[in-house]
Amino acid sequence: EATGSAELKGTKTLTGNRTLDPEQFSFKLTTDPEGENLVKDSTGKDMIVTSDADGKFEFPTLNYNQDDVKDVEDISKGKDFIYYVSEIKVPDDPTYTYSDKVYKVVINVKDAGGKLTVEEPVITDNATGEKATLQFENHYKAKGSLNLTAAKKLNVHSDAVKLTANQFSFVLFGDGIKKQVKWNDAKGTVTFDQITYTEDDIDKDFTYTMTEQYGKLSGFEYSNEVYTIKVHVSDMRDGNLKVDAKVTNLEGEKVPLENMQFDLFFNA
């Protein structure tokens, strides 16, 4: 009995500053564009495959024999076998943006006098009808953040001088952020706007500088302290970014992130 076969291969690309893992994404071959009626392989298993670390995937060989085309009315035209390829999405997964692509695959099979001829698959985008290859693109989404605070400490041994809200101002500036100017609250706490990071920042380094702005309040000796915050962003591979921040003061000494302090003296 004459037989023939066809191969279906595709690729997966992942954007978002992230590499692919083996068997990370799955694809299915169906007989309907909705992806409900799965094609079976020669062993009766559903044709569902996964991509490898290079983003390549391949369905089991599609085999045909003379029985598949015995009822063809026009032998010269043969018979078209129509399939659809789509990606299997993971429900409620905010980490990735999955592809909505559905590809139509047409494979023509002819019985030419006892010899089976299987044409190369003709692949089109099911939405547009344009010729295509089996290519799916996903985007990896990740986020992380850094919250920076400082303390203003008033070194005065007098009840006549007290720290009040919005009395002193502080500046934060550096890589990738707009210059921030913040004022202390009644307890001396200075809170800067949260700095956020995305997948575009993976494996990048950032440097920020925090200082006090000199004011004109009579009798006060403002701090000349300068804090340098160096940040490295790394991927946790689960949609979260690790933001590692290290702080040094003006003398180059290490300072805990939560211990940035500006001392203020009053000269009566």
Residue ranges and their predicted role:
Residues 1-268:
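Solvent-exposed loop/turn and edge beta-strand elements of beta-rich ligand-binding domains
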